[in-house]
């Protein structure tokens, strides 16, 4: 009985030892698992710290964006206030524009009528200008004809002068050859008188031709001045019409 009891104790002791060893193994396993958990927890902690730092950076960016948005909101509010003021000004300007538009329509009609009148005046001036130019051509032709006549008269004068000179020489020859007789003196006097009359007639014609030339030159100058005046007036009317057309286009726009 005593032996069996010792054996039983030994068995129980071995069982306890095995239980203790089993618990030690379990403890080692738990410790290993705990170390693995600690390593994993450290890794997760580092990752979490990185995520926290990232979140903090994102928070700072969000805060900065929020500040920017706040500033933009304030600017937009200021612009909205300004736009409200501008809107009121636009309303007033629109009312004023509508009032002026009615007056502008009447002004445009008046300008259109004035442009029509100016265009008619321009057409009339162009007709008068063409007539002046035609008259100028005629005057130039008359001057050319008068010049030709003057040249012919000068040639005739030269011929008459030569004739008078030859006549005087002939008279001197007759006086030297035949002496002085009353009959010859009368004939010579008649010839001289005839030649003098012819010379005076030629001088009168020359003076008339010169007067005609002077009149023609004066007419040409007056015609040229009138043409310049008409051209100047026509140019001024064209500029005035162009200015009125521009004003009408601006008012229409």
Swiss-Prot record:
SUPFAM superfamilies: Tropomyosin (SSF57997). Residues 7-253 form a coiled coil. InterPro entries: Tropomyosin. Keywords: Coiled coil, Repeat. The keyword Protein transport does not apply. It holds the Pfam family Tropomyosin. Tropomyosin, in association with the troponin complex, plays a central role in the calcium dependent regulation of muscle contraction. Homodimer. The molecule is in a coiled coil structure that is formed by 2 polypeptide chains. The sequence exhibits a prominent seven-residues periodicity. PANTHER family: TROPOMYOSIN. Belongs to the tropomyosin family. This is Tropomyosin-1. It comes from Hydra vulgaris. The gene is TROP1.
């Amino acid at each position: 009985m005593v032996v069996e009891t010792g054996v039983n104790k030994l068995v129980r002791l071995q069982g306890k030892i095995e239980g203790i060893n089993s618990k030690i193994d379990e403890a080692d396993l738990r410790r290993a698992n705990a170390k693995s958990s600690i390593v994993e927890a450290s890794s997760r902690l580092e990752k979490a710290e990185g995520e926290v730092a990232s979140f903090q950076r994102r928070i700072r960016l969000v805060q900065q964006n929020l500040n920017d948005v706040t500033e933009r909101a304030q600017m937009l509010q200021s612009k909205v206030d300004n736009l409200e003021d501008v809107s009121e000004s636009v309303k007033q300007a629109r009312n004023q524009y509508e009032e002026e538009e009615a007056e502008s329509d009447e002004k445009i009609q008046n300008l259109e009528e004035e442009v029509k009148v100016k265009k008619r005046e321009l057409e009339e001036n162009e007709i008068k200008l063409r007539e002046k130019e035609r008259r100028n051509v005629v005057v130039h032709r008359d001057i050319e004809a008068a010049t030709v006549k003057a040249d012919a008269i000068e040639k005739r004068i030269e011929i008459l002068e030569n004739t008078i000179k030859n006549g005087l020489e002939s008279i001197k020859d007759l006086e030297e050859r035949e002496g002085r007789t009353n009959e010859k003196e009368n004939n010579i006097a008649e010839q001289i008188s005839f030649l003098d009359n012819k010379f005076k007639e030629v001088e009168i014609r020359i003076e008339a031709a010169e007067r005609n030339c002077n009149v023609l030159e004066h007419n040409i100058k007056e015609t040229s001045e009138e043409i310049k005046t008409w051209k100047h007036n026509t140019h001024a009317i064209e500029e005035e019409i162009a200015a009125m057309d521009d004003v009408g286009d601006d008012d229409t726009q």
